[in-house]
C-alpha cells in the first residue's frame, strides 16, 4: 500500500508584526485541508510590500515565539538567508528539494495577495508547484472573483478558506506600538 503524500502549508508574509489573525488562518488551513504542518516563512525584503518594515531578524524571532506552543507550526528562515528580494518561486523550489516529490504544497494567502497573484513573478510555474488557499472574510468571494476566474482559465483552481473577520491588522498594531498603546491580546 502506498504511503499518503505529505501535505504542507506555506504561509509566507512580512509578519510586520505577526498577530493572532496569521495564527488563526494557519490553524484553520491545517484543519480544513488536512495539512501535516504549516511552515511560516517571513520575507526578508518582500517584493510587494511597503518599506516601513520592522528589521528582518526581529520579525523572524517574533514569528518563532508566536508558534512555539503549536507542534504543527514551524518557522523557516529560508528567505532571510537570501540576498535582496525573495520570490515565492525560489522558496517553493527550496521546499520541493527539501521534502521531495511525495509532498504536496499549499500556499496560504489573504485576499490582497490573492488579488495580486496574476502579477507575481513566475506565477505560471508556481501553479505547477503548489495549490493556493485563499483565506478570505465571509462574503468576500466577490473581492477575488477575477482571480478565481484567472485560475480557472489556466486549468487551476484556488481553494477558499473562509475565516472570521478580525478587526486587526499589522498596520493597526504598528500604529498602536508607535504611540505607546496596548497590544495585549492582539499579538
Question: Locations of the language-model features?
Answer:
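Nucleotidyltransferase catalytic core that binds NTPs
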Residues: 1-187
Amino acid at each position: 500500500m502506498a504511503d499518503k503524500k505529505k501535505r504542507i502549508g506555506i504561509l509566507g508574509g512580512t509578519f510586520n508584526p505577526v498577530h493572532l489573525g496569521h495564527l488563526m488562518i494557519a490553524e484553520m488551513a491545517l484543519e480544513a485541508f488536512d495539512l501535516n504542518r504549516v511552515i511560516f516563512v517571513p520575507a526578508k525584503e518582500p517584493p510587494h510590500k511597503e518599506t516601513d518594515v520592522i528589521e528582518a531578524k526581529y520579525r523572524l524571532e517574533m514569528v518563532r515565539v508566536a508558534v512555539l506552543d503549536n507542534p504543527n507550526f514551524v518557522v523557516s528562515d529560508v528567505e532571510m538567508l537570501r540576498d535582496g528580494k525573495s520570490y515565492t518561486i525560489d522558496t517553493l523550489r527550496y521546499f520541493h528539494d527539501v521534502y521531495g516529490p511525495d509532498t504536496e504544497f499549499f500556499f496560504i494567502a489573504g485576499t490582497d495577495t490573492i488579488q495580486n497573484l496574476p502579477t507575481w513573478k513566475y506565477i505560471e510555474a508556481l501553479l505547477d508547484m503548489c495549490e493556493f488557499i485563499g483565506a478570505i472574510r465571509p462574503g468576500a468571494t466577490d473581492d477575488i472573483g477575477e482571480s478565481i476566474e484567472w485560475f480557472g482559465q489556466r486549468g487551476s483552481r484556488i481553494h477558499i478558506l473562509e475565516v472570521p473577520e478580525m478587526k486587526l491588522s499589522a498596520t493597526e498594531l504598528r500604529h498602536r506600538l508607535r504611540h505607546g498603546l496596548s497590544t495585549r491580546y492582539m499579538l
